[in-house]
Amino acid sequence: MTKPFSVVLASLLAITSTVSPLASAQQSQPLDRIAAIVDEDVVLQSELDRAVRNVKSQYAGRENQLPPDDVLQRQVLERLVLVKLQVSRADGNGIRVSDEELNRAIASIAQQNGTTVDGLRQKLAADGMGYADFRASVRDEIIVQRLRQSFAQSRISVSEGEVDTALAQQAATGSQYHLAHILIGLPEGATAEQIATGQKKVDGVKALIDKGELDFSAAAVRYSDSPNALEGGDLGWRSLDEIPNAFAQLIRDMQPGQVAGPLRGPSGFQLLKLVEMRDANAGGEKKMVTEYHARHILVRIGENQTEAQAKAKIDTIRARIVGGADFQATAKESSEDTNSRGQGGDLGWFPADAFGPDFGKQVESLTDGAVSEPFRTQAGWHIVQRVGSRQTDVSAENQRAQVRETIGRRKLEEEYNRYLQELRGEAYVSYRTGDRADDNATAAPAKSADPAAPSPPPAKPTR
């Protein structure tokens, strides 16, 4: 059996919506320029400058880990291009964000930054950023999240067999691994010359790390083509089921602090660092919950039955049961819940909150065999009979859910990165970092002037 994998993304991309700490205010407001043309959209120089300042603010006190300004600008611009492409694709797929949803998101951002929406406006003004621009940025990032969610729901699935295999593997190793990586990207269908250039660059990066001239995190920020380069290439904690099979065996044999590679993967050359490891089973105590077995009878309220009529009907049904009528037989005859009526109102075993707080409170308050007084929920009027209760260990169930989630996340990361490469390859992108918005000339993005840098990766094609 294959189940769809769904993912909820909880944070906005820092590249465009980070508010705290706020970067220093602009000293002047020059005529805006076009940094890049992206199909029928553009990235303005003001957007690029603001995004670069946001990245620098996140590295306050660690500026030496950032690449030269021209390299950083190119990395950030490429991210903004990808945001524009995703927003455009989402719009074509009918993904929208209402003003009400946007207002709630901004209120949440303000709260996370310890201020109000008005206070947020003031901070943005001090940063030289208009509130309308900020709203547009947040809207774009929510849209990108929803595009990822839609992608996950339509293309990512995890089978029970995959979960079983991962659980067996996890039981055999019992370890989780904190990883970081550096990706030297190669275009799809790379030529021999491009592969050789990529190999030369990754060898150069590895040499810098081995000599101690750069630590791994700084090298990732400076040279990696991965979307998480500006986070030092940090991949977080992974179990073996989240790691591509080609790398899993290698990681098993590594010690914390070791760097492996270069390794050739589908996206290019990789360097992989094992930051630390831990026992995945530590703290894995049982989690016990109370489950209840119950039956119910529902009388709905609608066009053909008023509130008063429904209440009178449920009162009559309860009186019959209290008078000796069998609950199951009465449910088959009178319940308006089509899902459970055929089973005599039987709901099986469930935790108290499975059918909402009102229903749960009624079940919890009963003794086994007792029948509740009529009570109202959004569905209508109910009576419920508690059949039994038990303590259940749900740790195994939770573990399966967690493993399914981690496998799904790994698949989503791999597939969505390929999807982004496809979007980027199909798009018309022209870099115009030196031109005013009303000029027609174009200019390629600046290359690194760092004399110690290995050769840059092959340029991504533009049309």
Swiss-Prot record:
GO BP terms: Gram-negative-bacterium-type cell outer membrane assembly; protein folding; protein stabilization
InterPro entries: OMP_Chaperone_SurA (IPR050280), PPIase_dom_sf (IPR046357), PPIase_PpiC (IPR000297), PPIase_SurA (IPR023034), SurA_N (IPR015391), Trigger_fact/SurA_dom_sf (IPR027304)
UniProtKB keywords: Chaperone, Isomerase, Periplasm, Repeat, Rotamase, Signal
Catalytic reaction equation(s): [protein]-peptidylproline (omega=180) = [protein]-peptidylproline (omega=0)
Annotated PpiC domain residues: 174-276, 289-388
Species whose genome carries this gene: Xanthomonas euvesicatoria pv. vesicatoria (strain 85-10) (Xanthomonas campestris pv. vesicatoria)
Protein name: Chaperone SurA
Ranges of biased composition (kind: Pro residues): 453-463
Region (Disordered) residue spans: 328-348, 432-463
EC number: 5.2.1.8
Keyword Ribonucleoprotein found: no
Role description: Chaperone involved in the correct folding and assembly of outer membrane proteins. Recognizes specific patterns of aromatic residues and the orientation of their side chains, which are found more frequently in integral outer membrane proteins. May act in both early periplasmic and late outer membrane-associated steps of protein maturation.
Record's comment describing the protein's domains: The PPIase activity resides only in the second parvulin domain. The N-terminal region and the C-terminal tail are necessary and sufficient for the chaperone activity of SurA. The PPIase activity is dispensable for SurA to function as a chaperone. The N-terminal region and the C-terminal tail are also required for porin recognition.
Disulfides per UniProt: none
GO cellular component, one term: outer membrane-bounded periplasmic space
GO MF, any single term: unfolded protein binding
Endpoints of the signal sequence: 1-25
Composition bias type Low complexity, residue spans: 440-452
Pfam families assigned to the protein according to its UniProt record, in alphabetical order: Rotamase, Rotamase_3, SurA_N
Subcellular location: Periplasm
